[in-house]
A protein has these predicted regions:
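Cys/His-rich microdomains that often coordinate metals
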Residues: 8, 27-30, 169-172
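Helical (often loop-to-helix) elements that flank the catalytic cores of nucleotide-handling enzymes
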Residues: 319-361
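Histidine-centered divalent-metal-coordination microenvironment in nucleic-acid enzymes
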Residues: 1, 165, 202, 293-327, ...
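Cysteine-rich micro-motifs
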Residues: 16-26, 161-167
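Short cysteine/histidine-rich zinc-coordinating motifs and their immediately flanking basic loops
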Residues: 13-19, 35-36, 175-184
Length: 541
């Protein structure tokens, strides 16, 4: 095809051409001051540019693209060339945002993005759901994605990490707060009487794998100038700030037990399970019960969260509660007191251990909890930790990924090169290398250390709870859907046919989704401040 004539340079563009569309959710963007988009135009990239967007990158098949036809007048041809030149001056993100904004189904696309809170990495689904009356077979409700933009529905990614998806992590933190709080104060089908039962806030730490630099006071003061076997000073007279990169780093990396650190992480979940079992046994023994009959008299409920310390070692915070044999609905026995529970927790934390598999390269290690054990009772009279503060702390931490705490990355490491290029400290990198090395030893194959090198060998969930502690994430999501007005047909039959067709955003879609998420966050903060002001005004009356 011969080249089109009449192309103008950017300096000689027709400035009277149609303005660029306004983008939603981004008040300060230079394009937002322009006129609204012309929805009659279905060409997102201009009449000279055809687009072939992969369905996994954005909304399915490309929108209809208008091409230059022989019926176009010279003025139409000039306008098309001018518009194409103007678009080429913009970034890929801006061009893609204009393409989306000029689509006829742009309003519905905005509704989907707003409904998922501006999710940063939505899942794209295609299919249908039909709800039928269980008796007559009458269709009560039907939904199909064929009428949606790109013939697909966008749903939340539900990632808990704020570094991956801030909107979904904020929602997950809110669910976690209500889950933990319900187990402390009641609510969500948990009776309010649990607030008067024995409840503890427990902290268990990892053991020492070698001296590390600390923050606050003088780091490691010594009167002598002793050195380790590798010729490095054993002391450190500096006062490190909390943001000092040295905080958490070994005083001597050659003396540090990296193997023990990684293997302790790999067995931390098993160590917690044995701790819970031993607490039950000690409670039974302390009141003269046969250990196997403890479940007939009481039940131990808990919710625990794992947190990385500055030294990149996991420690555990847990809410522990003593109930009757049927859980929250039963009162605990008369002998069940907070003091008795504290004694059992401390004794079990010092006693339980896990032995690693014997390896000719490493031998057999005995793994225990660290010596720093804290168990504080939770009271309703304000003496001790506040219930809401405990729930808020746990909820805040579940949104943090390994990369945010500086103790790993949020994505798996598939080869040695990934470890060497990871944006982490040398201490964390050495832990990753140790995971990779130990993962090649046959005796440690079941631990899958290479697959979990990005979390330094720790394989457990960030938040775990016992079955009877409180509600569940699924129940909270169902309650939220009901609150949003989703119809519930208890006696109906639902037929679902869905398939995964992609995930994520194109550059322009990500740009607008971020703006929508920011606007929603600002609106929530304004509503929270208004609610606080209203409560304060009512309190002064």
């Amino acid at each position: 095809m011969p080249p089109l004539q009449g192309r103008r340079s950017p300096q000689n563009l027709d400035r009277t051409a149609s303005p660029l569309p306004r983008l939603p959710g981004l008040r300060n963007h230079p394009l937002t001051s322009q006129a609204p988009p012309d929805h009659a135009r279905s060409d997102p990239h201009g009449p000279l540019r055809a687009t072939h967007h992969h369905p996994c990158r954005f909304g399915g098949p490309p929108w209809k693209v208008t091409t230059i036809t022989p019926e176009f007048t010279p003025a139409d041809r000039r306008a098309a060339l001018n518009r194409a030149a103007r678009l080429r001056q913009l970034s890929e993100t801006d061009r893609d945002a204009i393409r989306i904004a000029q689509d006829p189904k742009f309003t519905r696309w905005l509704e989907q993005i707003t409904a998922i809170g501006g999710c940063s990495h939505p899942v794209h689904l295609s299919g249908s759901t039909t709800t039928l009356d269980g008796t007559t077979g009458e269709i009560l409700q039907h939904y199909d994605t064929r009428t949606e933009p790109g013939e697909r529905l966008l749903v939340r990614c539900r990632n808990r990490r704020a570094t991956v998806c801030a909107p979904c992590s904020r929602l997950h933190a809110g669910d976690t707060y209500h889950l933990v709080r319900a187990g402390l104060l009641g609510g969500k089908n948990v009776p309010a009487t649990i607030r008067d039962r024995p409840r503890l806030f427990v902290t268990l730490t990892a053991p020492s794998f070698g001296p590390v630099h600390g923050a606050g006071e003088r780091c490691r003061p010594r009167r002598d100038r002793a050195e380790c076997d590798h010729g490095r000073p054993l002391g450190c007279a500096a006062v490190h700030d909390a943001t000092d990169p040295l905080v958490g780093q070994p005083v001597c990396a050659d003396c540090y037990d990296y193997t023990g650190h990684v293997l302790w992480h790999a067995h931390a979940s098993k160590l917690w399970d044995r701790f819970v079992i031993d607490v039950r046994r000690r409670l039974a023994s302390s009141v003269g019960l046969v250990q196997s009959r403890f479940a007939q008299h009481a039940r131990l409920s808990f919710a625990r969260v794992a947190e990385y310390q500055k030294r990149a070692a996991v420690h555990v915070h847990a809410v522990v509660r003593l109930d009757g044999p049927n859980g929250p609905d039963d009162e605990p026995p008369a002998w069940g007191t907070a003091e008795l529970l504290i004694g059992a927790v401390r004794a079990s934390a010092r006693r339980v251990l896990v032995r690693t598999s014997h390896s000719p390269a490493v031998g057999e290690l005995v793994l225990r909890w660290g010596t720093q054990i804290d168990a504080r009772p939770l009271h309703t009279n304000g003496d001790g930790p506040d219930d809401d503060a405990v729930a808020a702390y746990v909820a805040k931490y579940v949104t943090k990924g390994a990369s945010e705490t500086g103790a790993g990355t949020d994505h798996p490491l598939t080869n040695w090169g990934d470890i060497e290029s990871a944006p982490v400290s040398e201490h964390v990198r050495t832990l990753m290398r140790t995971c990779w090395h130990l993962g090649g030893i046959p005796e440690y194959q079941p631990l899958r250390l290479r697959a979990w090198a990005h979390t330094l060998g720790y394989r457990g969930h960030i938040l775990t709870k016992s079955r009877a502690y409180s509600t569940t994430y699924a129940a909270l999501r169902a309650e939220r859907a009901h609150h949003m007005g989703h119809a519930d047909y208890p006696d109906a039959i639902t037929e679902r046919h869905w398939r995964y067709v992609g995930s994520g955003h194109t550059p322009g879609a990500a740009f607008m989704a971020t703006g929508i998420a920011d606007d929603l966050a600002t609106a929530r903060e304004a509503a929270r401040e208004a609610d606080s002001s209203t409560r304060g005004a009512l309190g002064t009356r």
